[in-house]
Structure formats: structure tokens, C-alpha cells
């Protein structure tokens, strides 16, 4: 194993730990987070949330990267096993229309994929490309 990800089993505790700078967090960051007005990239929090929810639903989680070019690589946030097929998952805190890594993975391994999921903050839909877009709160249903 050359790369791995670690997740905290309690996302609420994780958020508190990430933003725990008493003078700043309690007064500004934490209030903005609670009001859903934080401008920061919250991808790592959403990924942790998904890891917690998918694991609670009984899924074994896998992570995958593959080379894009000499200096860059693609990253698939999660892979789920479904029989002899896999389900790649991308987690988006914003900008859900861009999913380059997931598209590259789907093109490379199309015969091995059952369903492709993108979790995001909007409503459920099935895209033109047969990608399934799912709101975060439905993670336990896949």
C-alpha cells in the first residue's frame, strides 16, 4: 500500500477538532459553519461524513488513485464492492459538474463498474452519463 486515507469515526468531533482555535473558531468559523456560510473548501469534512455513513451502513471502503501524467494522479474517493462489480464514489462539497477523476476511472474500467455515484448537496438525479447524483443524507441507502 503506497497511499491511504484515515477518517475519524465521529464527524461532529472531527469538525470540532479541525476548527478548534478558541479565539477564532468559536466566534467566526464555527458560527459560519453552523449557518452554512463558510467559504472554505469543506471536501475533507464531507469525505469524512461519507466514510462514517457508508461504514455505518455495513460497507467496506476502498480508495483508489491512478496516474494521470508524470506529476499528477486521479483519485477516486471511495470504491464499494458489489458482487464481481465495483461502484466508484466521488464526494463533492461544491462544483459537482466537474468530476474528472471519476470520469477517467469510468472510462478506464467501464466493464467492471456496476453504478457510479456522486454525493453532493443537491437533489437526487440520474445524469445523462448514467452517473447517479445523490444527496449526502441518502448515503446509507446505496
Language-model regions, residue ranges each:
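Accessory nucleic acid-recognition modules appended to NTPase machines
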Residues: 1-75, 80-83
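Hydrophobic/aromatic beta-strand patches that form the interior of the parallel beta-sheet core
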Residues: 7, 89, 117-119, 132
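Switch/connector loops and helix/strand junctions flanking conserved nucleotide-binding motifs
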Residues: 16, 99, 125-129
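Active-site ExK catalytic segment of metal-dependent nucleases
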Residues: 85-96
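Active-site-adjacent loop/helix micro-motif of nuclease/hydrolase catalytic cores
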Residues: 95-104
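Arginine/glycine-rich "motif VI" loop of SF2 helicases in the C-terminal RecA-like domain
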Residues: 105-114
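Domain-level recognition of nuclease-like catalytic cores that cleave nucleotide substrates
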Residues: 121-142
